[in-house]
Amino acid sequence: MSRTSPHQHQPTGELSRRGLLKTAGGLTAALALGSASVATTADAAPATFTHPGMLHNAGDINRAKVRVAAGTDPWLSGWNRLTANSHSQSTWTPRPTATIIRGGDGQNYPQLYNDIHAAYQNALRWHVAGTAANGDCAVRILNAWSSTLTEITGNADRYLAAGLYGWQFANAAELMRGYAGFDLNRFKTMMLNVFYPLNDRFLREHNDACITNYWANWDLCNMASIMAIGILCDDGAKYDQAVNYFKNGGGNGQIRRAVPFLYPGVEGYDLGQWQESGRDQGHTVMGMGQMGALCEMAWNQG
């Protein structure tokens, strides 16, 4: 079994963003591209953004509704696990704060991610079952944070907070777009003023470290946040920023650095080696998940 650098692959024709970003289902598909096709600057943003169009589109939601209503497994079993989770209850009380700290003294970031999970899970319950109490709860959480949060700080881990929680928060908001009482404009302002500047700064400066100092998951969560914010705000420039970094960025989250080697012809498959494979399985799988989220959002935009 030979090891092949993707940089040695022969160039092929230019792919559309869907052709490249369907790597959520198979990362090595993108690695089969040659350097000539990837080095061009993408003009990837759709003329009109699809909503909902992040991790779930309208077809996904309808399919879940139909399968759950029919009592079909594994959909019903998954639904029952969702509804039994404490974060999925309409009685959830948000705990917004003006400053989120991750890394260093005074860390309080679990307040944010627990509320994000609750908003997202209540939003799913509202979409699938139509229960107004869950929709109201999701909006209550989103509005509480958009009226309160002004800063994410801490040591270098603040960039992880802005990235990880940025794309997750935007996904919850995307599901509640158009819901009565949801202050979408204020939520957009929070995402643009609190999350995006950290996402953008990390990809440009990498916390003033060598550009390859940080593992792939650091780049990827910030790329996913920028893409999600672009979709939420109908901002093509931000969407393109994420796609272009995926293709051409200098950090370890760029596709050729995130999966630096291919092992071709293993029982009929090309296997890819993840950039963090020598670290631990938790971070390795998380990085793949971050890239999967990025690619799924791009796929749902067409």
Which residues fall in each region the model found?
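N-terminal secretory signal peptides
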Residues: 1-16, 27-43
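Short coil/turn linker and secondary-structure boundary residues
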Residues: 15, 56-59, 70, 182
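Internal alpha-helical transmembrane segments of multi-pass membrane proteins, especially GPCRs
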Residues: 22-25
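Boundary of Sec targeting at the N-terminus
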Residues: 45-47
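Boundary/entry segment of secreted carbohydrate-active catalytic domains
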Residues: 50-53
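N-terminal carbohydrate-binding/catalytic regions of secreted carbohydrate-active enzymes
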Residues: 58-136
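Aromatic-lined, polymer-binding surfaces characteristic
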Residues: 107-301
